[in-house]
């Protein structure tokens, strides 16, 4: 184990032989870890609430900051996955958040891949989302199984009840205005950017379906 910084890995039970290969660098980095293996924690307050966890990577101030019992999460960036698992000891697994505030509001969601600043920043209990690009899918809270790739893709999608959206938006501003529509495939810059509540649409090409706001199928 390697601990560098005030209170880094300060709670780790080194008398237990299995607690090995942990690295924590920064003030209070991994400060609450009692049982853990192969965690890499770098940054002030990074994973500072984690008690039991394995093979997590947290890099950046307050990255994975409130996770208590998760494993195999990757959080890179200021407050990335910052509130994951807050208030619960139930384990949350396999989330990837890379970029400032990426997935910062996730509490119990799992298997999300969020790459880019502000990506999926409002998601809480949501699963299986793939989000790449600055500000992509930033307002949705409970939507699952969305794919948003590109600057501000699915920018306004927001399901306030648990919903499998199955929306796919790829391109600059693709699906920009979609709020509660489902099963849409929008590929190309500004594709379906005016669509709001329409469902079951396919739009491929620059500005395809860019003036329809409510249409379905």
Give residue spans per PLM region.
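Glycine- and small/polar-enriched repetitive beta-structure motifs of secreted/surface proteins
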Residues: 1-217
């Amino acid at each position: 184990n390697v601990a560098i910084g005030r209170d880094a890995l300060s709670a780790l039970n080194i008398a237990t032989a299995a607690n090995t290969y942990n690295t924590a660098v920064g003030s209070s980095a991994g400060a609450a870890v009692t049982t853990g293996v192969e965690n890499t924690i770098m940054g002030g307050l990074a994973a500072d609430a984690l008690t039991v966890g394995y093979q997590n990577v947290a890099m950046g101030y307050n990255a994975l900051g409130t996770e208590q019992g998760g494993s195999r999460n990757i959080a890179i960036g200021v407050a990335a996955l910052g509130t994951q698992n807050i208030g619960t000891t139930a384990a949350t697994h396999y989330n990837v958040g890379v970029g400032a505030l990426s997935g910062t509001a996730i509490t119990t969601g799992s298997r999300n891949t969020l790459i880019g600043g502000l990506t999926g920043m409002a998601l809480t209990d949501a699963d299986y989302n793939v989000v790449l690009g600055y500000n992509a899918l930033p307002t949705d809270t409970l939507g699952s199984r969305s794919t948003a790739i590109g600057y501000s893709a699915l920018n306004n999608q927001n399901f306030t009840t648990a919903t499998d959206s199955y929306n796919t938006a790829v391109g600059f501003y693709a699906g920009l205005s979609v709020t509660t529509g489902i099963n849409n495939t929008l590929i190309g810059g500004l594709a379906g950017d005016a669509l709001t509540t329409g469902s079951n649409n396919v739009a491929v090409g620059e500005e395809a379906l860019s003036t329809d706001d409510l249409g379905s199928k």
